[in-house]
Amino acid sequence: MSEVTTAEFNEEGKYLRKIRSFVLREGRLTKGQAQAIESQWPTMGLDYSPVPLNLSEVFGREADTVLEIGFGMGASLVQMAKDAPEQNFIGIEVHKPGVGSCLSDAAIAGVTNLRVYHHDAMEVLEHAIADGSLARVQLFFPDPWHKKRHHKRRIVQAEFAELVRRKLKIGGVFHMATDWEEYSEHMLEVMNAAPGYKNQSADGTVVPRPDHRPLTKFEARGHRLGHGVWDLMFERIA
């Protein structure tokens, strides 16, 4: 378990350093995950460098690019890439078994429009992604840090909202989802106060799950048990 705190920014909102908003649980790789990393990383893996990516070179084309922070085991990200071959997808995940699982699923699905980082998302966003380059940023089911004294560790804070805004194109969307209602309220408070965004909800709250976000098995089970999931979508307007 690693030390966990929040990111820090200077007065201009530039990322300075981070103490992670996640707990590192590395876990053991299965044979299949290890094989997928070995075989698929040369084509789908992105090695971190503090230089902005040239997306047209990375994907070999000009297309809208979607970036997902913390894709877990990657099943929904692979499904999204398969369902939208006209878009480019980049996933960031710190847990190596998740990276291996994602690459394995992507190879089986035959997707060619997906690239993956095994690195800290804050560093990737600040240094490896050009400003104004993304059509959508996705943050699905981040750690809610339930205890009040841990709320400062939540990734959705004012400074993070500004970092995401800088990376989005005008008209690009920051899409969040959580199964913890209190965290959805926190997200809503942060995002409604964040300059340069417009809530895509007609009533200024949450939105129905959009078709582009697959329903996960965990989520479907939660629905059957009466558990809620809250989606928030904010468009960059300035």
Swiss-Prot record:
It comes from the Bacteria. Pathway: tRNA modification; N(7)-methylguanine-tRNA biosynthesis. One of its GO terms (cellular component) is tRNA methyltransferase complex. It catalyses: guanosine(46) in tRNA + S-adenosyl-L-methionine = N(7)-methylguanosine(46) in tRNA + S-adenosyl-L-homocysteine. Catalyzes the formation of N(7)-methylguanine at position 46 (m7G46) in tRNA. InterPro entries: SAM-dependent_MTases_sf (IPR029063), tRNA_(Gua-N-7)_MeTrfase_Trmb (IPR003358), tRNA_methyltr_TrmB_bact (IPR055361). This is tRNA (guanine-N(7)-)-methyltransferase. HAMAP family: tRNA_methyltr_TrmB (MF_01057). GO terms for molecular function: tRNA (guanine(46)-N7)-methyltransferase activity. Keywords: Methyltransferase, S-adenosyl-L-methionine, Transferase, tRNA processing. Transmembrane segments: none annotated. The active site is at residue 143. Substrate binds at residues 147, 179, 216-219. S-adenosyl-L-methionine binds at residues 68, 93, 120, 143. It comes from Shewanella putrefaciens (strain CN-32 / ATCC BAA-453). Its EC number is 2.1.1.33. Belongs to the class I-like SAM-binding methyltransferase superfamily. TrmB family.
